[in-house]
C-alpha cells in the first residue's frame, strides 16, 4: 500500500512538472519581426530556464496571439499596444471575448510601413483612393492600425480602396506580380519581406509618409501612437527618410501566469540580452529605461514588477 501511494505521488509530481515546463511563444508570420524574435526568445528560455521547454508558433500576429493567450493555456505573446488595449477592454475584434492580460515587457516600437513601388504613381496616403491595397492579414494588428490610418486620412476602408487581406510576405509577392498596388505593414526594422521587395530587380520601392495621421488616431483611440522616422538607409532604394506613425510592442501573458514564472522570463531576457540581439537587432531596444507604465495600456505582471523593483526601476 505504501509503495503504491508513493508511486502515485511521484507520478502526479512528474506530470505536473512536465506541464509546467511547456511554454508557447505566439509570434507572427514568417516574413515579419515577431517570428525571429519569438524564435530567439524560445531558444533562450529553453536554454537558460531550468525545466522550461519553449516553442515559437507561427500566427497571424497580435490579434491571434491575444486570442491564444485568452485560452488560459501557457502562452507568451507579442502584441502591439493598440490591439492589446482592445483585448483588455473587450472592444473591436474582442467584443464578447475580453482577455485578462498582463504586460511582461515593453519591447520596441512598431513602425507603420505603407509600401508601394514607383510604377504605381502613388506618392501620398490620398493617392491610395481607388487602388488595390492590402491592409494586412486577418487576425493581425496591422489590420487594426491600417483601418485607423485610412480613416484618419479621410478614406473609407470599404469604399475607397480595393482591399486585400494579406500577410506581409503575401503582400510583397502580390506587389511583384502586380496584383496589388500598395500594402500596409506595421513592424520593426528591418522587416525581412520589405527588404526582399526593396532588393528585387526592376522594383523601386516607395515608402508613403503617414505620420500626419497620428493626431487624428490619438484623438479617437487614445494616446497610443507617436510619429517617428524610417531612415532612408533601412531599405535599398528609399529616396528619403519616411515619416511614419508608430506604436509600442509589448510582451504579454494571461493574468493567471504565476509570479515566479513571469519573474523568471523577464530576468532571463535581461540576463541574456546579447543572445537575443543575435537573433534580431530589435532586441537592442528592449531596455530597462523603456519600461514605463505610460508605454503600455496593460498593467505590468506582479512578477515583472518584482524584477523591476530589484533593479530599483522607476516606471513612471
Describe every region a protein language model picked out.
Residues 15-20:
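Sec/Tat signal peptide C-region and signal peptidase I cleavage site
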